[in-house]
């Protein structure tokens, strides 16, 4: 049985409420999201700490695209023992990463199901609670063979493709240092109107010709 719902940020209920409820009720989770700000992470910290205590494991894939996800966020997420963190580094300046998908696996004595949320919300304070956002939630029960349905399987397959991509980098201290150095270069070059592109192995500076 499938059930689809539209999630918006309203006066009574918000995307934040749905996210917290699904995190609290899942047996595992997978999140692919372009931007995670520290303000967005802050409102989720207590829930993430509770999941760590309960040994509920998850995978989070975010990105360096647009430099919206800060080194501080990556460092804090890396401290959770139950979270496997990867960072997608687009291969060229013309490639972006703007996906927002939240997957929750839920099991009970009676059933097994996936809840998938796909839409416009990043993990930022405003996106979680106040922005005009549209997100579609779909609950999909697993069949007799305990396999996900067609829709959920397609989302899981796409997540796995991105997760295993050569552009999805494991978090490490070396990665964090490289990213911080890059952001410092961006700040120094902003006044010169230069365009910088972050890569895990090189820093390329492209300054417009006069």
Language model features with spans:
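PLD/PLD-like phosphodiesterase catalytic module centered on the HKD motif
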Residues: 1-210
């Amino acid at each position: 049985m499938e059930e689809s719902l539209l999630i918006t940020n309203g006066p009574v209920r918000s995307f934040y409420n749905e996210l917290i409820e699904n995190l609290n009720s899942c047996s595992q989770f997978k999140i692919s999201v372009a931007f995670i700000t520290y303000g967005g992470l802050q409102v989720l910290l207590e829930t993430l700490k509770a999941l760590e205590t309960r040994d509920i494991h998850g995978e989070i894939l975010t990105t360096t695209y647009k430099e919206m996800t800060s080194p501080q966020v990556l460092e804090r997420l890396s401290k959770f023992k139950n979270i496997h963190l990867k960072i997608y580094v687009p291969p060229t300046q013309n490639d972006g990463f703007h996906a927002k998908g939240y997957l929750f696996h839920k099991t009970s004595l009676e059933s097994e199901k996936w809840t998938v949320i796909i839409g416009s919300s990043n993990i930022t304070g405003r996106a979680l609670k106040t922005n005009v956002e549209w997100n579609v939630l779909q609950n999909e029960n697993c069949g007799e063979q305990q396999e996900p349905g067609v829709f959920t399987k397609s989302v899981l397959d796409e997540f796995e493709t991105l997760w295993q991509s050569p552009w999805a980098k494991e978090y490490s201290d070396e990665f964090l240092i490289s990213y911080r150095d890059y952001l410092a270069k961006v700040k120094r070059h902003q006044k010169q109107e230069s365009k910088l592109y972050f890569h895990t192995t090189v820093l390329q500076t492209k300054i417009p010709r006069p």
